[in-house]
Amino acid sequence: MSMVEEAILVNGKKIVDAQRNYFNTGVTKSYDFRLKQLKLLKAAVEKHEKQIVDALYADLRKPALEAYATEHTITLADLDLAISNLSSWMKPERVPTPLFFMPGKSRIHSEPYGVTLTIAPWNYPFKNLIAPVIGALCAGNTMVLKPSELAPATSKAITDMVSEFFEPQYMTVVEGGVKETQELLDQEWDFIMFTGGTEIGRIIYQAAAKNLTPVALELGGKSPCIVDSDVNLEVAAKRICWGKFTNTGQICIAPDYIYVQKDIKAKFIELVKKNITEFFGADPKQSPDFGRIISNRHFNRIKNLIDGDVIVGGQTDESQKYIAPTVIDNVTPESKVMQEEIFGPIMPIMEYNTIDEVIGHINAGSKPLALYIFSNSSSFSDKIVTETSSGAVLINDVLVHAGHPHLPFGGVGNSGMGAYNGRISFDTYSHRKGVLTRSFMFDVKQRYAPATEKNTNFLKFAIRKLIG
């Protein structure tokens, strides 16, 4: 082992040990402490507003409107919700007590896991790190934050913000790349949250399994979008274009491919072309509202997916990491663009005759993180919801469910496990501990040895009648 590797290893252990020692003092568990830290985090996000928004532009050329709506202001809304509801979230939950356990009372206590690690992606490098951390803080944990090295300006902004407002034994940021992340994974954690790709998610899961560490994994996949013939097509096309090309398509829940009922496909394509021009002008490369691809590696991967009947866009410029909003028609399940998650500004369009063929195609693949349906027919939507599996379903819109504070945001199968958002984030970073308090009254003698046939029959009867 080199001296550099040894230094990283010692540093990582030192961070975790310091946080575990701090957690073991019990100071993080009180309501007053947690509320104070939430208010500090809110003050930090407010104070560093300009640095955060500027960093998002530097890393992704993310427009200010998008940066506020999807990263900065939405995080402040998450903090306001947590501050208002922390007291109720922390209260023990009363649950029914069956007659067999009476007299007694039953509660579920939420207790912090302890030392937590939250690893964020580069596509929403601020929101997808701080939003889960709000849950970790509310639950009473200590926190190590690992921002993405592919968004270095945002990583620095988060480091500056956290180091100014928090002590490292409570909350700290570890910057760096693969080496630093692997070194963190070699430590013993009480909980790990990861947002990113499925392959890296498997590595995180394997590392956590060594210590039986619980995890939440928010991954990705090819999120389908289905457009019924019974629909407000103008609104549907506008919302789909917005969701597909926001953040240059670099969104884990972006509508990956579009299934359009064959009778309306031509009209849908006409509206898509119109919307792209309205959003980004005749030359999206010059638009301040259209971003860039995060890295040359991702640029080349996405560029290689542009194949087939390109009817809009297709232009690329590696020097700027620019890929135009691109629409590909007459796509089939065998097309190159359908073999992996796109994570870029390419919209494949497929047509269908019956909804059963669409459901069959979706169910033949991995379970997606999101599934989108555009239809005025509740029976059409209900059939898809019932007969497919996905992390979430959004009907007649795209993306916005991710910001809903009362709905779980997370995946299933290859798209992930666990969830966050609002109270759900608090629950994700908490161990729900059952607590049963019994009375000394009515001590049933039949439970004790020596066992007799009469006692056994009594207990069999009591268990069936008084528990079930």
Q: What spans do the regions from the language model cover?
A:
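N-terminal Rossmann-like NAD(P)+-binding subdomain of aldehyde/semialdehyde dehydrogenases
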Residues: 1-107
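ALDH superfamily catalytic-core signature
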Residues: 2, 6, 199-332, 355-356, ...
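Hydrophobic packing residues within well-ordered alpha-helices of enzyme cores
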Residues: 155-158, 184, 204, 268, ...
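Rossmann-like NAD(P) dinucleotide-binding subdomain of oxidoreductase/dehydrogenase enzymes
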Residues: 99-235
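Structural signal for hydrophobic packing residues in well-ordered secondary-structure cores
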Residues: 27, 42-45, 49, 60, ...
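Residue-level signal for inorganic ion chemistry
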Residues: 34, 79, 140, 171, ...
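Conserved C-terminal structural/oligomerization subdomain of aldehyde/semialdehyde dehydrogenase
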Residues: 2-3, 21, 30, 226, ...
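Residues at or immediately preceding the N-termini of alpha-helices
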Residues: 12, 31, 49, 233, ...
